[in-house]
Amino acid sequence: MALLQLERISAQYPGSPEPVLSDISLTLGPQQLLVALGPSGSGKTSLLNLIAGFVEPSAGRITLDNVPVKGPSAERGVVFQDDALLPWQDVLANVAFGLELAGVAKDKREQRAREMLALVDLSGFEHRRIWQLSGGQKQRVGLARALAADPRVLLMDEPFGALDAFTREQMQELLLQVWQRTAKPVFLITHDIEEAVFLATDLILLAPNPGQIVERLHLDFGQRYAAGESARAIKSDPRFIETREHVLAKVFSQRSAVQRQERA
């Protein structure tokens, strides 16, 4: 059963002669981790912004639990690449911030915040200031904050793009652990091919100008990690390597097509 459904979505910004997205249809169901991958200009961030309710489509329909998406909502938690944390607040207050805005009593919101910090392995960091945290720790706080409101769907906008390679791998593995424990459906966008193949249960490849889905893949590598197989073993599996190379070739062919159009 689909929780989130996009039906023939197109998006065009005011003053732009061309749509940024064209005829996008997809569904996100329980326990899916849907990853959108594509070159620059393929509309990945625009697609996430539509689902988040930050902008409205120029055509088509987006529903969550059969209710039209109209504006931002706590039912769609968002984790940004830029952590967007409050530097004047400590970690606990940052995680509890959305609950405070929703009028949740202090003891209940702090209890929930502590539970989410434990989920992302940050117990003991409650009273640290944001400036005292590493990049990976800040992203853990952002993830805990998004989960604190118990959203129906978790949206992630290139959440690990600014991290070093080692921390990025740690965060990928943490995300899979959190995804398994919470059973939250996740929609994540990335420009990193190996990350996309490793994390996704479902992978959509977007072509640019305008952004449209050109291929869909059903994968199980992230599920294998969540079931206990090591990331190293998975990423050295010939099937993983073959899938990664297939996706790489597809993305490069789309990029080459764009470059030919620009030279024409």
Curated annotation (Swiss-Prot):
The main enzyme category here is translocase
Q: Which residues form the ABC transporter domain?
A: 4-233
Which catalytic reaction applies to this protein? taurine(out) + ATP + H2O = taurine(in) + ADP + phosphate + H(+)
- What topology does it adopt in the membrane? Peripheral membrane protein
Q: Is Iron among this UniProt entry's keywords?
A: no
Concerning InterPro entries, the annotation shows: AAA+_ATPase, ABC_transporter-like_ATP-bd, ABC_transporter-like_CS, ABC_transporter_ATP-bind, P-loop_NTPase
* UniProt keyword annotations, A-Z: ATP-binding, Cell inner membrane, Cell membrane, Membrane, Nucleotide-binding, Translocase, Transport
Main localization category: membrane
* UniProt entry tagged with the keyword Nucleus: no
Which regions span the lipid bilayer? none
Q: Which SMART domains does the annotation name? A: AAA
Listed binding positions for ATP are: G38, P39, S40, G41, S42, G43, K44, T45
GO terms under cellular component: plasma membrane
Give its localization.
Answer: Cell inner membrane
Q: Name one Pfam family in it.
A: ABC_tran
Q: From the UniProt record, which GO molecular function terms apply?
A: ABC-type taurine transporter transporter activity; ATP binding; ATP hydrolysis activity
Q: What EC identifiers does the entry list?
A: 7.6.2.7
Assembly and interactions? The complex is composed of two ATP-binding proteins (TauB), two transmembrane proteins (TauC) and a solute-binding protein (TauA).
- Write out the similarity annotation: Belongs to the ABC transporter superfamily. Taurine importer (TC 3.A.1.17.1) family.
What does this protein do, in the record's words? Part of the ABC transporter complex TauABC involved in taurine import. Responsible for energy coupling to the transport system.
Q: What is this protein called?
A: Taurine import ATP-binding protein TauB
Organism of provenance: Pseudomonas fluorescens (strain Pf0-1)
Q: What is the lineage of its organism?
A: Bacteria, Pseudomonadati, Pseudomonadota, Gammaproteobacteria, Pseudomonadales
